Amino acid sequence: MKYFEFTFDTHPCTETVNDVLAAVLGEAGFESFVEREGGLTAYIQQSLYNEETLKTELANFPVPDTEISYTFAEAEDKDWNEEWEKNFFQPIVIGDRCVIHSTFHQDVPKAEYDILINPQMAFGTGHHETTSLIIGELLDSELTGKSLLDMGCGTSILAILARMRGAKPCTAIDIDEWCVRNSIENIELNGVTDIAVSQGDASALQGKGPFDVVIANINRNILLNDMKQYVACMHPGSELFMSGFYIDDIPAIRREAEKHGLTFVHHQEKNRWAAVKFVL
């Protein structure tokens, strides 16, 4: 699968600007991001790139007085472990109970759940607010013996943690070939079983389930579009956790969820990002 590598320069270059830029680029089809001095490096499948879409998204950038410029070239088809080392991917501890690190890390903190991740083209290492929010939800949930779906699984970090916490069986689905390959590698690294990984979008859910727990950490538009398909593979009492959007998006997410019979339980937030929990 061929990718373009984009280098975005932002002024001012702040954490907020970079977070919003990553979200905006996600709406334009970009799927992988690396923070760099002065902005972001981002990746998109060549077959999905649309110049007009990108220009429109940047023209409507929601942070006032932000200047954004970019260049791009064809990306090498390679393993991204070395790139993450260069970009200071450090071990992260979430909730004092879960540590996420890679094979190249030394002096890793001890925690109840130790997860190994070797990222390739899938960026789900626990560092982003949305991933850490869902991890926090999983740490606070009773998962033993529950069937679980990780939709838009990325590195499958969430499915791996859920399996470690007793969820069984687990299903992990992602539209991206790299994510599927990386998920399989990460599952093997962690020595967990009963996680079935497959490639596809929400249409791949037809005939699957019902699941006791569904996780979808993607983005606002995909969640709004695909929520009815998540509900179709749930049963009364199933839990749905969603993230990948901002606090301001919660009302739209709630309206769509309630149209499909879901009941809002609570939300969590971190640096303007949100995660929500619903029950069917």
Swiss-Prot record:
Keywords assigned by UniProt, alphabetized: Cytoplasm, Methyltransferase, S-adenosyl-L-methionine, Transferase
EC numbers on record: 2.1.1.-
Primary site of residence: cytoplasm
Superkingdom of the organism of origin: Bacteria
This protein's name: Ribosomal protein L11 methyltransferase
HAMAP family, alphabetized: Methyltr_PrmA
Keyword Chloroplast: no
Xref: PANTHER family: ELECTRON TRANSFER FLAVOPROTEIN BETA SUBUNIT LYSINE METHYLTRANSFERASE
